[in-house]
Structure formats: structure tokens, C-alpha cells
């Protein structure tokens, strides 16, 4: 059994990587005023691909319980499959449904990981919030796509969820990083 400090020293980097990916996507959706279909496909594909890669980097780390790796692998796989599907779609509505479905599946998988492992693995507690936000923002994208909303609205819904996930994971990752630095005697400031 590893101590919380040993776990923190291993998981903070992939958590911070996923936070940066989510924040970059979310902020991009805020500042691009007139995204077209191609921009929407590229942005969703990049977000899903880099989120899946960051999740894979996280779940393959030694302290992550082996049983927790299955649902997190499903989340990463749903996001990567979403990237492949997006390549073949040609309308904002269908792209929105596909991207939203990938976010929903990833969110459900994260909620399963949280429900099964929150007591034994402290970082798994983040999966409650990332899973809920993924589920709700993905569901929002699907509903908006089916109602005929355009790329700006669909990216905005997903981007809002990404900003929430990014901020949560940034706080979590920096907290784990600070614990490690404090124990090593290298923490400065607060």
C-alpha cells in the first residue's frame, strides 16, 4: 500500500496535463466568435484526443488501482473513438451528437471509477466532478445538436464544461504537487 505522498508524486503530472488540455479547449471556445464546421470538428477532435491521451497517461500509473483502470480505459477509448467518428461526419448536428455522446460515455465511465474506488484511492474522488461535468456537458451538446444549434453554441456548451473540469483538475493537481514539494522541503510561500 502506497502512502498518500507517494501517490501524489506520481499522479499530479497527468492530472495537470488533463487540466491544461481542458482549459485550452474551453478558452478557445470562448474566444473564437464564428467557428465553422471544420473548426468545430478539429476542436472537438483535439479535445477528445488529448483528453484521452491524458487519461491514458493517468490510468497507467502504478498507484492507480488495477480495477479502476477498466472504467478509465473505457473513458479514454470513448474519447478516442469519438475522434475517429468525427472524421467522417459532415453536419454540425451530427458532429455535435457524436462529440456529445463521447463526452457522455467518458463521464459515465469516470462516475463508475469514482463509485468503485473513491474510498481506497484519494485521487479517484475527482472523478465524481469530472464525470458529472462530462456527462452533463455531453448531454447538453447532444440536446442542443438535436435542436439545430450551430457550431458556436455546441462548442460553447462543451467548452463551459471543459473550463469547469480544467479548473477542478488544476486545483487538484497543484494540491498534489504542493504536498510533494512540502514534504521534500522545497515548497515556498504559503
Language-model features: locations:
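Loop-to-transmembrane alpha-helix initiation sites
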Residues: 123, 149-160
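Cytoplasmic-side transmembrane-helix entry/capping segments in multi-pass membrane proteins
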Residues: 64-77, 122-131
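Hydrophobic residues within the alpha-helical transmembrane core of Major Facilitator Superfamily
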Residues: 23, 49, 56, 80-81, ...
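Membrane-water interface at the C-terminal end of transmembrane alpha helices
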Residues: 89, 112-123, 141-147, 165-180
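N-terminal topogenic module of multi-pass integral membrane proteins
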Residues: 1-65, 149-150, 174-190
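Hydrophobic alpha-helical transmembrane segments in multi-pass integral membrane proteins
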Residues: 25-27, 81-91, 134-151
Amino acid at each position: 500500500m502506497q502512502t498518500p505522498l507517494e501517490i501524489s508524486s506520481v499522479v499530479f503530472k497527468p492530472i495537470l496535463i488533463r487540466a491544461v488540455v481542458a482549459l485550452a479547449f474551453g478558452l478557445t471556445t470562448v474566444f473564437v466568435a464564428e467557428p465553422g464546421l471544420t473548426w468545430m470538428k478539429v476542436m472537438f477532435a483535439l479535445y477528445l484526443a488529448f483528453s484521452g491521451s491524458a487519461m491514458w497517461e493517468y490510468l497507467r500509473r502504478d498507484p492507480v488501482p488495477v480495477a479502476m483502470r477498466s472504467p478509465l480505459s473505457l473513458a479514454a477509448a470513448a474519447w478516442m473513438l469519438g475522434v475517429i467518428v468525427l472524421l467522417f461526419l459532415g453536419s454540425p448536428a451530427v458532429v455535435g451528437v457524436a462529440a456529445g455522446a463521447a463526452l457522455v460515455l467518458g463521464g459515465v465511465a469516470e462516475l463508475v471509477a469514482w463509485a468503485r474506488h473513491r474510498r481506497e484511492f484519494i485521487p479517484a474522488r475527482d472523478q465524481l466532478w469530472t464525470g458529472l461535468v462530462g456527462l452533463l456537458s455531453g448531454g447538453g451538446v447532444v440536446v442542443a445538436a438535436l435542436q439545430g444549434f450551430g457550431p458556436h453554441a455546441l462548442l460553447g456548451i462543451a467548452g463551459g464544461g471543459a473550463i469547469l473540469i480544467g479548473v477542478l483538475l488544476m486545483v487538484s493537481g497543484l494540491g498534489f504537487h504542493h504536498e510533494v514539494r512540502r514534504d521534500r522541503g522545497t515548497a515556498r510561500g504559503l
